[in-house]
Swiss-Prot record:
GO terms for molecular function: ATP binding; ATP hydrolysis activity; microtubule binding; microtubule severing ATPase activity. The gene is katnal2. This is Katanin p60 ATPase-containing subunit A-like 2. SUPFAM superfamilies: P-loop containing nucleoside triphosphate hydrolases. Severs microtubules in vitro in an ATP-dependent manner. This activity may promote rapid reorganization of cellular microtubule arrays. Keywords: ATP-binding, Cytoplasm, Cytoskeleton, Isomerase, Microtubule, Nucleotide-binding. One of its GO terms (biological process) is microtubule severing. It comes from Xenopus laevis (African clawed frog).
C-alpha cells in the first residue's frame, strides 16, 4: 500500500481526535453520574467517586438543560420511535450465590462497542423522516394497498423491491433519472479514485482543525483508569498498584522540545522511540517496531530529566515518574512484586512511558554511572544515548537565553553588555545547570549593591531614589567564572570511554 505524507498526517490527526473524543465522552459520563448522585443526595457515593476518578466536582459543572435522567428519557423516546417499544435497561439478577460479577471492559472493547452501537444511527445532515407509531387496524385496512404499491415499485425498479420502510424506520424512495442522461449502463466509465480520496482527506483535515480547538491534552485533565479494576479481585496486587499509581505524573511540567537547547541527537532518538510510533504507527511495523527501552546517561546537569519532562509534556501517554524509593522495600520479595506491578500497570494504562531516575541505584551495586548496570538490563536498553556536556553554540545560546541584552522582570530593568561568543568559549566543560548558576550569580552582582542603601535607610520622611541596576558586563561574568567551577568536567572522559565500548544510537 502506497503511503503519502498527507495521508499519514491526516491518519495521525484522526487518531488523536478520536482518542480525545473518547476521553471526553468518558469524563462527561462520570461528571454526569457525579452530578446525579449529588442532586439525589448520595453525597458519600459522590465523594467516593470523586476520590477514585480524581475529578473534582468543584472544577466541572453540568451545562444547563443537561441531566442524566433527561438523557435516559431522550434515549427511551428515540428507541420507541425506532422500534415501537421501550428499551429494557435492567433485568432481575440471578441468585446471589451464582451471580457473576461484572468485569470491567477494556479500552479496546469500549471502542468496539461504541463503533457497533452507532452503526444504525442516522448521519447528521441527511434528511430524516420520523415514522410515528401506527395502530394495528391501519395495517389491516391498508394491507391490500401496500401489496399493490410493492408490486408497482417492483415493476418500476426492475424487480428489486426495497425493504419495507416501516420495518427499519427509514424512508426509501426511488431516484428518477434526468431526461438528458442515458438509461443504459456505461461499462467503460472511468472513476477518479485519487480525487475522491483527496477530497475525503481534505474534509477530514478541516473537521479535525475545527474540533481541535476544544481539545486540551493537559496531563492534569487526563482521566486515569480506576485501580479497583486492576488484576481482578487480588487485593494484594491492588494495594501495590495504589503505591505505584501515586507516581503517575498528572501535573504539566510545561517543557517543550524547543525549550531544550542543544541535545539534537538525544531529542531525535527520544522522539523516534516515544513520539513517532504513537503518531505514525503505520511506519513502525515488523522490523521497524519501536525501541522498548532507552538509557540516557551522562554527567549530571546536562538535561536528562529535562528530556523526560518534555516527553511528559508533549506525548499523550501515561507517564510514570519512578524513583528508587518507590520500588525498593525492606521486606523480602516486595521489590520484585512492585516491579512486576509497575509493568502490568503500564500495560493497563497503555500507551505508557516509564521514567526510572538513577537506574543504577536499584541494581546490585550502587554506582555513579552506566558501568554499574547489569549486562542483562543493559541488553534490554536497546538505545543508549549519551547526554554530553553542551557544545560551544549551545553554551552561547544558554547564556543569551538566561542573560538577554535587556531583562525586565517584576518592573526592575537589568541590562547586559556581554560578548556571548567569548563567554561561550570560556565556559568549556560547564554543564547546563552550571551555566544557569553562573548566569544567576552574574545577575545577582548589581543587585547586591543596592542592599546597603535599602538596609541603611532609617528616615521615614526621606524618599528612596528610584532603583537603577548597573549593567552586567563581560568582565563581571568572567569574575563569576573564576569563583564558580564546573561540577562534572572530570566525568566527561569517563562517559566518553564507556560510550566507545557500549554505544548504541
Amino acid at each position: 500500500m502506497e503511503l503519502s505524507y498527507q495521508a499519514l498526517r491526516v491518519a495521525s490527526q484522526n487518531r488523536e481526535a478520536e482518542e480525545l473524543r473518547t476521553e471526553a465522552r468518558r469524563k462527561n459520563l462520570l461528571i454526569l453520574i457525579m452530578h446525579y448522585l449529588l442532586q439525589e443526595g448520595y453525597v458519600d457515593s459522590a465523594n467516593s467517586l470523586e476520590q477514585e476518578t480524581k475529578i473534582s466536582s468543584r472544577r466541572f459543572e453540568v451545562c444547563d438543560n443537561v441531566d442524566l435522567e433527561t438523557i435516559l428519557m431522550e434515549y427511551e423516546s428515540y428507541y420507541y420511535i425506532k422500534f415501537q417499544k421501550y428499551p429494557k435497561i435492567t433485568k432481575k439478577a440471578l441468585d446471589h450465590d451464582s451471580r457473576v460479577q461484572p468485569k470491567p471492559r477494556s479500552a479496546g472493547k469500549l471502542r468496539r462497542a461504541g463503533s457497533n452501537s452507532t452503526q444504525g444511527l442516522p448521519r447528521i445532515g441527511q434528511q430524516q423522516v420520523i415514522h410515528r407509531p401506527v395502530s394495528s387496524s391501519y395495517y389491516r385496512t391498508n394491507g391490500h394497498q401496500k401489496a399493490l404499491s410493492r408490486e408497482n415499485s417492483k415493476q418500476e425498479s426492475g424487480g428489486n423491491s426495497p425493504q419495507e420502510a416501516s420495518e427499519v424506520g427509514l424512508n426509501v424512495s426511488a431516484i428518477s433519472k434526468a431526461s438528458g442522461e442515458g438509461s443504459h449502463t456505461r461499462r467503460r466509465q472511468v472513476i477518479d479514485f485519487r480525487s475522491m480520496i483527496q477530497d475525503t482527506i481534505k474534509g477530514a483535515s478541516q473537521e479535525i482543525a475545527l474540533n481541535s480547538l476544544n481539545c486540551n491534552p493537559d496531563p492534569s485533565e487526563r482521566l486515569i483508569k480506576p485501580v479497583g479494576a486492576f488484576i481482578g479481585g487480588n487485593s494484594e496486587m491492588r494495594e501495590l498498584a495504589a503505591v505505584i499509581s501515586r507516581d503517575i505524573y498528572l501535573q504539566n511540567p510545561n517543557v517543550r522540545w524547543d525549550d531544550i537547547i542543544g541535545l539534537d541527537a538525544a531529542k531525535r532518538l527520544v522522539k523516534e522511540a516515544v513520539v513517532y510510533p504513537i503518531r505514525y504507527p503505520q511506519l513502525f511495523t515488523g522490523i521497524l517496531s519501536p525501541w522498548k527501552g532507552l538509557l540516557l546517561y551522562g554527567p549530571p546537569g546536562t538535561g536528562k530529566t529535562l528530556l523526560a519532562k518534555a516527553v511528559a509534556t508533549e506525548c499523550n501517554t501515561t507517564f510514570f515518574n519512578i524513583s528508587a524509593s518507590t520500588i525498593v522495600s525492606k521486606w523480602r520479595g516486595d521489590s520484585e512484586k512492585l516491579v512486576r506491578v509497575l509493568f502490568e500497570l503500564a500495560r493497563y494504562h497503555a500507551p505508557s512511558t516509564i521514567f526510572l531516575d538513577e537506574l543504577e541505584s536499584v541494581m546490585s551495586q550502587r554506582g555513579t554511572g552506566p558501568g554499574e548496570l547489569d549486562y542483562a538490563m543493559l541488553r534490554r536498553l536497546e538505545k543508549r544515548i549519551l547526554v554530553d556536556l553542551p557544545s560551544k553554540e549551545a553554551r552561547q545560546a544558554m547564556i543569551q537565553h538566561w542573560l538577554p541584552p535587556i531583562s525586565n522582570s517584576s518592573g526592575v530593568e537589568l541590562r547586559m553588555d556581554l560578548d556571548y561568543s567569548t563567554l561561550g568559549e570560556e565556559t568549556d566543560g560547564y554543564s547546563g545547570s552550571d551555566i544557569r548558576l553562573v548566569c544567576k550569580e552574574a545577575a545577582m552582582r548589581p543587585v547586591r549593591k543596592i542592599f546597603d542603601a535599602l538596609e541603611n535607610h532609617h528616615s521615614e520622611h526621606k524618599k528612596l531614589p528610584v532603583i537603577s541596576l548597573e549593567t552586567v558586563t563581560t568582565s563581571d561574568f568572567s569574575e563569576v567564572l573564576a569563583h564558580t567551577k564546573p561540577s562534572a568536567k572530570s566525568l566527561a572522559e569517563k562517559y566518553s570511554a564507556w560510550q566507545n565500548e557500549f554505544e548504541s544510537v
